A protein has these predicted regions:
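Short helix-to-loop capping/linker segments positioned immediately adjacent to catalytic or ligand/cofactor-binding
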Residues: 11, 118-121, 146-147
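Generic hydrophobic, helix-prone segments enriched in Leu/Val/Ile
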Residues: 4, 135-137, 174, 202
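Classical Sec-dependent N-terminal signal peptides that target proteins to the secretory pathway
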Residues: 2-22
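Acidic, serine/threonine-rich low-complexity disordered tracts
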Residues: 21-101, 142-219
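Intrinsically disordered, low-complexity segments enriched in Ser/Pro/Gly/Ala and basic residues
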Residues: 10-12, 130-138, 159, 197
Length: 219
């Protein structure tokens, strides 16, 4: 019995060493040519509750996002969030909110998207724009490809990613990164680079589609 307990303790310890990184508060700034900027902040708001938020300005759009989440056995548990995206000065808007509630044994996402309101039952963990990368840093750095649940506009979708290690020049120095590329069937693209060190910072983000291409870099 003692051996079994010791094995479980060692197994959990080494799993944590392999799959987890230290989640610490931060304030990061990203820029995009010619005048784009993003401020992203991670705050610890209670013993096991975190808030990640970002505010971005670009000639094509402005975006404000916030997510509240906790961590359970190396998994991000998204509790609530919102996104306010205004394109071309408000010509197109994407405003949405979501919150996880319990109804008996069920977990429900209560959401609003524009004028639409609704709720759906959830059975698995899911992520939004901000928590997706945190979960990937915790569990998917060693996987060459994977699928992950993503919540957007009242629906849970499945995103597929490829992951490979690359060496790039960043701030005039060679840096090893994990390069994550979303697999899509349309003409949009999304890719981000995570530095392979203890902090696991996202140092570059590439996104685009019909009529726009935006590259962000950590200042």
């Amino acid at each position: 019995m003692v051996k079994n307990i010791l094995f479980k303790v060692l197994f959990c310890f080494f799993c944590n060493q392999i799959f987890l990184f230290d989640l610490n508060p931060y304030e990061n700034y990203y820029s995009s040519k010619p005048t784009g900027s993003v401020k992203e902040t991670l705050e610890k708001i209670s013993e096991n509750s975190w808030k990640i938020s970002s505010f971005g300005k670009h000639p094509l759009f402005t975006i404000k996002q916030e997510s509240i989440f906790s961590i359970d056995n190396g998994n991000v548990i998204l509790e609530s969030g919102f996104r306010k995206l205004d394109v071309l000065g408000g010509l197109r808007k994407d405003h949405q909110t979501y919150k996880v509630e319990k109804e008996g044994d069920q977990k429900i996402i209560v959401y609003s998207f524009g004028k639409k309101k609704g709720s759906i039952e959830i059975e698995e963990n899911f992520y939004d724009n901000l928590t997706l990368q945190i979960q990937i840093k915790m569990n998917y750095l060693k996987k060459d490809e994977f699928k992950i649940n993503y919540f957007d506009k009242g629906k849970i979708k499945i995103k597929s990613f490829l992951n490979k290690k690359e060496e790039i020049i960043y701030k005039s120095k060679p840096v090893e990164v994990f390069e994550f590329t979303e697999q899509r069937e349309d003409k949009r693209y999304f890719k981000f680079l995570i530095r392979n060190d203890s902090d696991k910072e996202t140092i570059k983000v590439f996104q685009g589609g019909r009529g726009f291409n935006v590259d962000w870099e950590l200042d």
